Amino acid sequence: FCPNHAGAMGPIRMCAHFELTDSCYSWMNNGMMEAKEVPAYVRQDYWWEPGCKMEPFYNATIPYIAAAIIPPILRSAPGVPVYHDNRVIKTFRRSIELLKEGKNLIIFTEQPSGHGESAAELNKGWLQIGPMAWRTMKVALKFYPVHIDLEKRRITVAKPVVYQPDVPL
């Protein structure tokens, strides 16, 4: 399942209200799962308006509060750590293991682009799960686009896009 992120509420809604949540494992940014990495991630992800009057205070407090609270919560949910370095192979290997067990993945594909924003362009690295699943399991994965509408409190799942091994990514 490939939902829009919808800020922090998108992942929360998918975990709390998605009807298939019991069989799903969310890809989770490892930068938010490890307490020592959270402060740097929070600062780069712009949790507050850059240049605001309170920025020095926020910079000195929010990242450390987040580091104490968020990692234990994320580690308690069924998830797959997503690495943004050469450890990314661990993300894909764990994902394939879960798919072999009949589990579903929730992959938030949007590229963050600043305070409360996501770029119109999607990340593309996650697509490699398609060829990997084909090579290891001979399964053509189905990618379900999911729209999370916070205003209407609705999660809409669209028709799947099926991976085609003969079509280049």
Describe the role of every protein-language-model region.
Residues 1-168:
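Soluble catalytic domains of membrane acyltransferases
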